[in-house]
Amino acid sequence: MVNPAMESDSPHLRGSLVVFEGIDGTGKSTQVELLARYLRSRGIEVVTGFEPTRGPWGMRVREAAMAGDRLSIDEEIACLLQDRREHVREVIEPSLQAGKWVLLDRYYLSMMAYQGASGANVEEIREWNEAFATVPDVALWLDIPIELSQERMHARGNGKDAFENEKFLSDCAAIYSAMEMPWLHRVEADGTVDEVHAQIREIIQEELGI
């Protein structure tokens, strides 16, 4: 397990890793950008990203899901783990060691929820990831009702992918709800964008002093 609090070898103080989690339609990408803007206004260097990435391993999962024909669960897990290994090695850890904050739209908690809802063992997924992946300083679970999630996805006008049926999203939400990590915080995300951002700012202030 990579300790998020470990000291960097660089002259910079180590940055912080903040990840945004939740089912589709919760507004994660919007809140990533709002927090990034706030942190930059405080003079903090910020790197934003998302998972699965646009690298070859992440795109295999994305393209199969958008085609409505998911990979097998074993193939998904293998691709997602390799995608994350490269992301940690090439982007996340170098940025943190340089003193930058990293904000991610999805991380390995999504894998626990989504592949867990597909039948994989949730705790095994956590163990596989934490064997190499940086543990977040703060994870923000943006929680909304399933009905609102589907309304928002419909309003976006994007075609449904293989992960977006109501029963599956309900199972994912149940797994998120059962997660117990001291750095995981639930955010009620069915309010306005500004209301959700205010909750996030409060958590970041309490946990990271910013």
Role assignments for model-derived ranges:
Residues 2-11, 36, 147-210:
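NTP-dependent small-molecule kinase module
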Residues 20:
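Hydrophobic anchor at the beta1->P-loop junction of P-loop NTPases
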Residues 106, 111-174:
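A glycine- and Lys/Arg-enriched "phosphate-lid" helix/loop adjacent to the NTP-binding pocket
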